[in-house]
Design a protein with these regions (language model features):
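Conserved helicase/translocase P-loop NTPase motor core
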Residues: 1-16
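Short internal beta-strands
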Residues: 75-80, 215-218, 238-244
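Acidic, Mg2+-coordinating active-site environments of NTP-dependent enzymes
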Residues: 4, 17-24, 39-128, 141-161
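Nucleotide phosphate-binding/pyrophosphate-handling subdomain across enzymes
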Residues: 20, 32-43, 47-51, 61, ...
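Glycine-rich helix-loop-beta junction characteristic of Rossmann-like nucleotide cofactor-binding loops
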Residues: 12, 68, 205-209
Length: 244
């Protein structure tokens, strides 16, 4: 199913004559159908213990699988602050220019926004200030900005900030206003299913300083890290409705 869906997407992209395509790996990377594409950039957001039945139960084994998307001589970007050795070894073997969060690019939170610094393709230092807070992890947005910087496209701070301000990801901190029995209610949809996503959700719930109570309608597949996903949420959610 996934392979055919990926093939259909490639066909549609080709017909549309796209200038750019952003492709997300379904699982791992090395053996994923998306890895058929010889990408210009390879981005690895973070390395956690997800899909352990397929990728192994250590960060090193997961990093080895994710490193399969890297290409010889093509930039490799990693948002993990502690990239495991197998990833670094693959970067060295391929001669891929490596851009690491905390070394080559980074972000810093401010009172009402955040700041970014990074590198252009020629090594020139770049910076953006007072960027808007987002409905998706800012670590990922910072990684995306570094990827954009390496594509050598026009660098206009105002337009980049506006693009971030308009960015929405359906199903990730996705707020919907509705009426329930004549009373206004807010629905928050989030499909995060690993500890990293749950931690980010918890951070944003704390920052929102909600009035009233949160009811969580919660479901998780058996192969996920249930304890890790639930750990950040006690104290933030008062009532639970658990789907079997």
């Amino acid at each position: 199913y996934f392979e055919m869906g990926t093939l259909a997407a490639f066909w549609l992209f080709e017909r549309a004559g796209l200038d750019f395509a952003v492709l997300e790996v379904g699982l791992g990377g090395r053996l994923d159908a998306v890895n058929l594409i010889d990408a210009d950039l390879a981005l690895i957001t973070s390395i956690g213990l997800d899909h352990a039945d397929w990728l192994g139960d250590t960060r090193e084994s997961v990093a080895f699988e994710k490193a399969g998307i890297l290409r010889a001589g093509k930039p490799a970007l990693c948002g993990d602050l502690d990239p495991p050795q197998p990833l670094l070894e693959q970067v060295a073997a391929l001669g891929a220019p490596l851009y690491l969060r905390g070394r080559d690019y980074d972000l810093a939170l401010a009172d009402h926004g955040w700041h970014w610094r990074g590198l252009a393709a020629d090594g020139q230092a770049l910076a953006l200030h007072d960027l808007p807070l987002l409905g998706l992890p800012m670590e990922n947005a910072a990684l995306a900005l570094q990827a954009y910087a390496l594509l050598e496209l026009p660098w206009q701070a105002e337009r980049l900030a506006e693009a971030l301000r308009r960015t929405r990801v359906t199903g990730r901190l996705d707020r919907r206003d509705l009426s329930w029995n004549g009373q206004p209610r807010q629905l928050l949809l989030d499909v995060g299913h690993n500890p990293q996503a749950a931690q980010y959700l918890a951070q944003r719930l704390r920052a929102a300083a909600p009035r009233g109570r949160y009811l969580a309608v919660f479901g998780l597949l058996a192969d996920k890290d249930l304890d890790g996903v639930l750990a950040p949420l006690p104290g933030l959610v008062q009532d639970w409705a658990v789907a079997p």
